[in-house]
């Protein structure tokens, strides 16, 4: 995100005119991570603690869209819409590599993203 926003600014964009849509993407309820993953984020910024809630055993649930919002906010981008759509949970609608790995399924899908610049 940092590199993308920087490139946009170099092309003449202004942070107050940048609009961001997050998602569909994996949501916190589906994104289980280990303590080492959490520690990496906490070492970068103590504010990252808010992105993790306790999961089962020593695991945590990570808020990826929240992380994106946090990073964008630090970059001065504040117009952010999060779809709230969970690619892992909505299996009839979206492919999820995490879901596929957990189930041992063959690789069968992809998602695409679009970035539009209008100066």
What residue ranges belong to the model's regions?
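Active-site microenvironment for binding and transforming phosphate-containing groups
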Residues: 1-119
């Amino acid at each position: 995100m940092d590199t993308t926003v920087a490139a946009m600014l170099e092309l003449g964009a202004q942070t107050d005119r940048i609009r961001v849509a997050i998602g569909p993407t994996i949501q916190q309820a589906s994104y289980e991570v280990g303590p080492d993953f959490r520690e990496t984020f906490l070492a970068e910024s103590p504010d990252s603690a808010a992105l993790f809630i306790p999961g089962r055993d020593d695991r945590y649930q990570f808020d990826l869209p929240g992380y994106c919002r946090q990073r964008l906010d630090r970059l001065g981008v504040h117009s952010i819409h999060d779809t709230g759509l969970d690619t892992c949970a909505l299996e009839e609608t979206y492919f999820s590599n995490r879901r596929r790995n957990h189930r041992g399924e063959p690789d069968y899908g992809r998602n695409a993203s679009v970035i539009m610049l209008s100066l």
